[in-house]
């Protein structure tokens, strides 16, 4: 498994395969999945974290069932751009996953994704209890949608480059 940049992922992704977004928390892993055209992110179930081995197995089973081509995992960078303990934990999780799968990972700056997800859920008048259940997958969708938009931008740039004289 490799940790790729978004540009490297854009070059390597096979067509018509889904990409998964992950919001790694201490108690849960929020998951979202793209459509086959990689335009839209849809929230999915949450994996309740137990220990790394069980978490990895649940994630890999999900990836196999959904035919996931890559994972976009939120990197919880501090507002000032520095990396704290949560970033270190995310990087360690990705490193450990690398021993279990060949599916590539992309680290995606997730600043304010949970805040944005919570605002949307509040605007949808979702109760506090239901918000708590859905927030991680909603945040994973924000992470994935940002990455999908970047992939689309890279694809437009690549097709524009081919037309240049």
From Swiss-Prot:
Gene3D superfamilies per UniProt: YqgF/RNase H-like domain
Top-rank EC class of the record's enzyme: hydrolase
One GO MF term: nuclease activity
Protein location: Cytoplasm
Pfam families in UniProt: RuvX
Keywords, ordered alphabetically: Cytoplasm, Hydrolase, Nuclease, Ribosome biogenesis
E.C. numbers: 3.1.-.-
SUPFAM superfamilies, per the entry: Ribonuclease H-like (SSF53098)
Listed InterPro entries: RNaseH-like_sf (IPR012337), YqgF (IPR005227), YqgF/RNaseH-like_dom (IPR006641), YqgF/RNaseH-like_dom_sf (IPR037027)
Signal peptide: none
HAMAP family to which the protein is assigned, alphabetical: Nuclease_YqgF
NCBIfam families: RNAse_H_YqgF
Name of the protein in its database record: Putative pre-16S rRNA nuclease
């Amino acid at each position: 498994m490799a940790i790729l940049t978004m540009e490297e992922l854009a070059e390597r992704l096979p067509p018509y395969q889904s990409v998964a977004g992950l919001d790694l928390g201490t108690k849960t892993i929020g998951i979202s999945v793209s459509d086959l055209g990689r335009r839209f992110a849809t929230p999915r179930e949450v994996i309740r974290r137990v220990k790394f081995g069980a978490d990895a197995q649940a994630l890999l089973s999900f990836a196999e069932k959904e035919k996931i081509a890559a994972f976009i995992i939120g990197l919880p960078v501090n507002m000032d751009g520095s990396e704290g303990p949560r970033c270190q934990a995310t990087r360690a999780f990705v490193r450990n996953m690398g021993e279990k799968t060949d599916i590539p990972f992309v680290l995606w700056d997730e600043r304010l994704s949970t805040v944005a997800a919570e605002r949307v859920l509040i605007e949808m008048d979702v109760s506090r209890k239901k918000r708590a259940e859905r927030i991680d997958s909603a945040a994973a969708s924000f992470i994935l949608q940002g990455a999908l938009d970047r992939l689309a931008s890279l694809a437009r740039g690549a097709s524009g480059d081919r037309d240049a004289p």
